[in-house]
């Protein structure tokens, strides 16, 4: 007789192969048809809210792996919070204005922005942004990210722009907005001012020169003829703007002799200068810095004085301790110059070329002027030493060219006006990781005023007018309200389409009586755009809330979006726009190198999704300790694919053994479960606790490692290995089999829900197969499982820790016996155990050792019994010996266990008594 048909063999229609690249798009289409976002929101209506506010990606190009990491982390958080019982809406957004889009329109459409009208150029920029919003939206959706994709927020929307103008108006009313002449970061290539957040640092080779400034009036301190003050600079092009030399009031300065000349340098730099210049530099006189204040030097090549002044920013890290000072080309220079009433001279235009004030260098680009100026200094015998240095230098974030400091009239937000309040708010926010708090605190504490104006076209205009009669700047609650009203109807294009009179309240008159006005031509910094999303989105959308529960972006946003959002929110409302801020690190390869095109070490998320599936990418995100830099490579993705396969196969095995299980009818009560089953539920309880803790603390790698280890070790290597016999061999409706199925059901039901925020497609695919699940239900509307208190039995855990330690030693002995060809399979073996007295007492209380060890028989010997020779002694259990022998009896044809009772049943002579009984009752 073929007894195979009498076994309860595993069976399921759930596919073994994930085939994710084909199956995921089908699931995505189903979500779209059923409107999964609306379904979930409806299911959570009236629950406590959790609002994660999306930091808007830039609407330019295809998504890259950084986007994928960011969006998947957010999706995991939102889906977990939904399943934790919260109403967790997610409104995705896009940052749509600014220089990068202008550059792409100029480059890809071949447009000369100066040759087309402003309105036409803005139309092209808007079309370009909308094109990439559509492209990126589909790419994000393909990653399995759930959100209100039909109603995202866009910084170019009319309502958004109107709300942004409102925030600007609130700040202006509090006198936080002002116009000033100050040095700002300036990109000559892009012809615009830049904010600190738009600066990136890269290595650059620069000229480093030491220059002599002859003393003109020594003020009774520097009395010798032919005395020179020596300065050092890495920007020779700024020398035409030199107005002063700054010393530190407390430093010691020395006059040294060089042939017939006398040079002044800081004493603290003397040894390094002797070495560099290869000169003896004998000291003639000493002075304290403050004694030299007011000494007047002559500019080396311009008919102009250069005065010695004092400043705290002077250091002895490099140079001579005598700092070349050009108030038009540096923030510290500007500040110290302001203290001394120096003019702000900036002989460089918006393209980085010298103006007429640059004298002989007029029309030259600053970088081209460097060698010319150095040559002129040589000819004038004013050059002491010339060198080249490699150093970290500020570059434009978009064109990657070096920037300059340039004094221009710009609009600023005064950070001093709300700095104290912002620092107090930082203390109230939860920063994850905690070092983020110090980082943003120091940035706000040290930050200069925020330059918010840009000399570009594609953006939100600064809503300020000028009276043509008196030149006064016009901004008031009344004018802001009118501009808001128009923008809400027409968008910011109205600023460029309408004359000033139509943008102002009807009959508006300046205080001077003037009735003719012109508009400001600058636009706002894009960081002001995205930085006001707390108003434009959180306050304006009824389904959201202000402040947000969480902002989550890369750690570079401490100086970017977190910073601008905090600044505008505190300035306008006196409060931070977020309760917590979470950051992720950056992507690196396995060698810790940053992703770059030149290294060819990038991983394309669209390619991974196409070849492996989005759930593999999502599992990688979950597995990464993303709060630090995240390693990625094709090899790592392959590892994730293998881990996914392990999890999927485990879930499939559970399903296949539940094909005849109805949880409503077939459950076995916890109190009636055998110990091994209660141990499995104990492990499930611990995993559930750990996973939920991981989600709550945003430590998603805990989620991955807990579930993966549970599938690989506690389930596959222990529990499932042990209960396979029961599942396949015991009577279909036997209590023993139903007990195992009860556990399998609880494990399956819990694991699918625990992993649903991560393996979003796979969880959706498997959910309809889970026994007892109502047709048409969604795993995304389910709630997270809980660890029942009765499962968490400490005494049981302690007992099974010991038992599994014994099992581990037995497994080693069986493997050695197999290698020594004593047995060919554990079921052909009988294991003889020789324990110490304590262990014997413990093992006598375990009734089913052969089931736990998966052998045909176990013989437990007394502790006092003499141990035979050749015994395998346990490595980790003192005095415990194991002997592996061939099992007595015959092999049961049905369960393959060797049993001396095989042949006793005449009807089924090839079966053991257990199997004969089961088959007889079929």
From Swiss-Prot:
A molecular function GO annotation: zinc ion binding
Residues noted as binding ATP in the record, renumbered to the chain: 597
Motif 'KMSKS' region per record, residues: 594-598
Subcellular compartments: Cytoplasm
Source taxon at top rank: Bacteria
Predominant place of localization: cytoplasm
EC number annotated for this UniProt entry: 6.1.1.5
Cofactor notes: Binds 1 zinc ion per subunit.
Entry keyword set: Aminoacyl-tRNA synthetase, ATP-binding, Cytoplasm, Ligase, Metal-binding, Nucleotide-binding, Protein biosynthesis, Zinc
Entries under NCBIfam families matching the protein: ileS (TIGR00392)
Protein name: Isoleucine--tRNA ligase
Organism (species): Desulfitobacterium hafniense (strain DSM 10664 / DCB-2)
Gene it is expressed from: ileS
């Amino acid at each position: 007789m073929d007894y195979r048909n009498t076994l309860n063999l595993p069976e399921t229609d759930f596919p073994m192969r994930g085939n994710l690249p084909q199956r995921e798009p089908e699931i995505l289409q189903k979500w779209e048809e059923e409107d999964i976002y609306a379904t979930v929101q409806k299911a959570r209506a009236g629950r406590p809210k959790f609002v994660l506010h999306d930091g808007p990606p830039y609407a330019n190009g295809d998504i890259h792996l950084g986007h994928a990491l960011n969006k998947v982390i957010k999706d995991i958080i939102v889906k977990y919070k939904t399943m934790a019982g919260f109403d967790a809406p997610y409104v995705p957004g896009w940052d749509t204005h600014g220089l990068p889009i202008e550059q792409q329109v100029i480059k890809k459409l071949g447009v000369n922005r100066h040759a087309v009208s402003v309105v036409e150029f803005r139309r092209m920029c808007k079309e370009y942004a909308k094109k990439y919003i559509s492209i990126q939206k589909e790419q994000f959706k393909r990653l399995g990210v759930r959100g209100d994709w039909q109603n995202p927020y866009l910084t170019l929307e009319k309502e958004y722009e109107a709300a942004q103008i409102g925030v600007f108006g609130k700040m202006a009313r509090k006198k936080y907005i002002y116009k000033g002449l100050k040095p700002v970061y300036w990109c000559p290539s892009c012809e615009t001012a830049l904010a600190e957040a738009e600066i990136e640092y890269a290595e650059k080779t620069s000229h480093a020169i030491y220059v002599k400034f002859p003393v003109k009036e020594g003020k009774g301190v520097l009395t010798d003829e032919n005395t020179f003050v020596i300065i050092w600079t890495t920007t020779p092009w700024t020398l035409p703007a030199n107005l002063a030399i700054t010393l530190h009031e407390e430093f010691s300065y020395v006059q040294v002799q060089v042939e017939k000349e006398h040079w002044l340098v800081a004493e603290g730099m003397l040894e390094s200068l002797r070495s560099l210049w290869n000169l003896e530099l004998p000291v003639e006189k000493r002075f304290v810095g403050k004694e030299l204040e007011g000494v007047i030097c002559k500019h080396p090549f311009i008919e102009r004085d250069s005065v010695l002044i004092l400043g705290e920013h002077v250091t002895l890290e490099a140079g001579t301790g005598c700092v070349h000072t050009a108030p038009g080309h540096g923030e510290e220079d500007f500040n110290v110059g302001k203290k001394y009433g120096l003019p702000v001279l900036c002989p460089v235009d918006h393209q980085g070329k010298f103006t007429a004030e640059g004298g002989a260098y007029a029309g030259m680009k600053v970088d081209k002027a460097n060698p010319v100026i150095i040559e002129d200094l040589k000819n004038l015998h004013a050059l002491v030493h010339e060198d080249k240095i490699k150093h970290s230098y500020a570059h434009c974030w978009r064109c990657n060219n070096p920037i300059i400091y340039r004094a221009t009239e710009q609009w600023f937000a005064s950070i001093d006006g709300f700095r104290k309040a912002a620092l107090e708010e930082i203390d109230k926010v939860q920063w994850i990781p905690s070092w983020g708090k110090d980082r943003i605190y120091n940035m706000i504490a040290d930050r200069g005023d925020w330059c918010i104006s840009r000399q570009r076209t594609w953006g939100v205009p600064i809503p300020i007018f000028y009276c043509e009669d008196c030149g006064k700047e016009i901004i008031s609650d009344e004018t802001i309200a009118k501009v808001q009203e128009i923008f809400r109807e027409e968008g910011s294009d109205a600023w460029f389409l309408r004359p000033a009179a139509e943008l102002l309240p009807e009959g508006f008159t300046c205080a001077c009586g003037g009735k003719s006005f012109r508009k400001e031509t600058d636009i706002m910094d894009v960081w002001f755009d995205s930085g006001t999303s707390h108003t434009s989105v959180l306050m304006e959308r009824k389904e959201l809330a202000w402040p947000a529960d969480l902002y989550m972006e890369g750690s570079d946003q401490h100086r970017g979006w977190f910073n601008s959002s905090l600044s505008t929110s505190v300035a306008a409302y006196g409060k931070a726009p977020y309760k917590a801020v979470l950051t992720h690190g950056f992507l690196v390869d396995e060698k810790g190198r940053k992703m770059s095109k030149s290294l060819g070490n990038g991983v394309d998320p669209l390619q991974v999704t196409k070849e492996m599936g989005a759930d593999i990418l999502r599992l990688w995100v979950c597995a990464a300790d993303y709060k630090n830099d995240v390693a990625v490579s094709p090899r790592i993705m392959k590892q994730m694919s293998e881990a996914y396969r392990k999890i999927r196969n485990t879930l499939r095995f559970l399903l296949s053994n539940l094909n005849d299980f109805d949880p409503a009818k077939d459950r076995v009560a916890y109190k009636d479960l055998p110990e091994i089953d209660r141990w499995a539920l104990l492990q499930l309880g611990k995993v559930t606790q750990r996973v939920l803790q991981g989600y709550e603390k945003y430590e998603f790698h805990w989620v991955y490692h807990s579930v993966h280890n549970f599938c690989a070790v506690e389930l596959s290597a222990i529990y499932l290995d042990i209960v396979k016999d029961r599942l396949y061999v015991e009577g279909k409706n036997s209590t023993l089999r139903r007990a195992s199925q009860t556990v399998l059901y609880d494990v399956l039901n819990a694991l699918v829900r625990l992993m649903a925020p991560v393996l979003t497609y796979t969880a959706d695919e498997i959910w309809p197969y889970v026994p007892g699940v109502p047709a048409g239900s969604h795993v995304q509307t389910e709630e997270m499982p809980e660890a029942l208190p009765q499962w968490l039995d400490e005494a049981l855990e302690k007992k099974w820790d010991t038992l599994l330690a014994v099992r581990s030693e037995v497994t080693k002995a069986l493997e050695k016996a197999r290698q020594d060809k004593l047995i060919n399979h554990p079921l052909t073996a009988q294991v003889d155990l020789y324990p110490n007295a304590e262990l014997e007492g413990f093992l006598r209380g375990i009734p089913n050792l052969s089931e736990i060890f998966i052998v045909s028989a176990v013989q437990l010997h007394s502790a006092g019994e003499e141990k035979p020779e050749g015994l395998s002694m346990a490595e980790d259990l003192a005095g415990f010996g194991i002997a592996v022998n061939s099992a007595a009896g015959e092999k049961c044809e049905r369960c393959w266990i060797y049993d001396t009772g095989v042949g006793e049943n005449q009807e089924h002579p090839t079966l053991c008594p257990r199997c004969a009984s089961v088959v007889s009752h079929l």
